[in-house]
Amino acid sequence: MRRAKGWVALSGTASAALLLITLVTLTSVRAASAPPDETRALWVLRSSLTSPASIDSLVASARTYGFNTLLAQVRGRGDAYYSSQLEPRAEDLQAQPASFDPLAHLLSTAHGAGLKVHAWVNINLVASASYLPVAPEHLVYAHPEWLMVPRALARDMATVEPASPAYLGRLARWTRSESGDIEGLYLSPLQPDAAAHLTAVVSDLVARYALDGVQLDYIRFPDERFDFSRYAVAAFRSDVAPGLPAEVRRELDAAAESDPLAYPNALPDEWSRFRRSQLSALVMRLRTAVRSRRPDAVVSAAVTPDVEDAYARRLQDWRTWLESGLIDAVCPMAYTPETPLFARQIASARGLAGTRAVWAGIGAFRLSPAQTVQHIQIARQQGADGFVLFSYDSMTGADRALDPYLAQVSRALFPPASGSK
């Protein structure tokens, strides 16, 4: 009993101390001021780009509530929410006349309202896990050999020609069965023709549209189990074999006769390095494509927030991208509702970014308006140059009609003049 009483007393003391710490922290957070030229952005899903009315509405909301930048998802799954000769028009636009160009309408309306527009481009992810595209010209049908293959299917897929319907069928079925972890079908940056296609898509975008920036998303591997496609493994073998001792090379060549994974299995560190370097090479190509067409456009990347996890599991070396100047801004997708973890992730990105910008990616879809405000203030406190809320669409449903989510965020954070420009 005495121990129980002591525990209660101690718990009360600890609770009081914790409350005091929390109040001090929150006071400090509230005091954080916005940096000069803060990027106040919204991620806009492609579902909000399907009509002139929906675009006009999102621009009006952004302007009213003090946001200054829209990251619009104009390439969702290897399709186009703009006029493209390289990829099929998005299925969601079937109800609109062929003359309707969502990106052109958005740029005209948003720039007229004083907002910046960045093309949010899903790079490697090109098809959903749950269904395949309708358009017969979609690249999953035109070039199934460009798709990443998981380790689990590597030996099986090595016996099937990519031109056979069975190739895509097996890959699609496996991906559907793993949809809890894998978003869909990915293009492989190890495929030179796939990398060239992606570069052409981005180059076409910035050449024909007055974009303020391009954000690279899904610029990663689904996880370390990919890409074990026949081309990728052969490319690795060609890259690494010349540097091996002759005896080791002979042994691996002999093993590869019966096991297509002989080289990756024997050289796992080199295999990861090779895949990582090829992804970084793609980032370099995309940056060059943007800057050669539109020198002032900002190149940003939405990244896995933990830099070590990104490096090891997603093969996404965004630390090097920053150090090498391949991106102008990094956007860690710090969607966690856990405030201490969010603070650590943004602080880490700020420490790694140097002179490059950090935009805190905030998972508003998982947070209350008050929590979103708190995370924005924490991002400011940690030295972020701006923030991006995911997503506009999740914050503007019918249940927000009485007191809109964005209105609550705006009242708490932005001076009145921000919403009246």
Predicted feature locations:
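Boundary/entry segment of secreted carbohydrate-active catalytic domains
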Residues: A32-S54, V303, F365
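Active-site-adjacent "subsite" loops/lids of carbohydrate-active enzymes
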Residues: D37-T39, L49, A119, N124-R208
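Short, acidic/polar
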Residues: S48-R63, A194-L205, D309-S324, F342, ...
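Catalytic domains of carbohydrate-active enzymes, especially glycoside hydrolases
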Residues: S54-A80, R208-G213, L326-A329
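Aromatic-lined carbohydrate-binding/catalytic grooves of carbohydrate-active enzymes
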Residues: F67-F100
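Aromatic-lined carbohydrate-recognition surfaces of secreted/lumenal glycan-active proteins
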Residues: K116-N122, Q215-P222, P264-R314, A357-L367
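Substrate-binding cleft/loops of secretory-pathway carbohydrate-active enzymes
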Residues: V126-A129, V134, Q215, E224, ...
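Substrate-binding cleft of secreted/luminal carbohydrate-active enzymes
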Residues: L326-R344, S348-A349, R356-K421
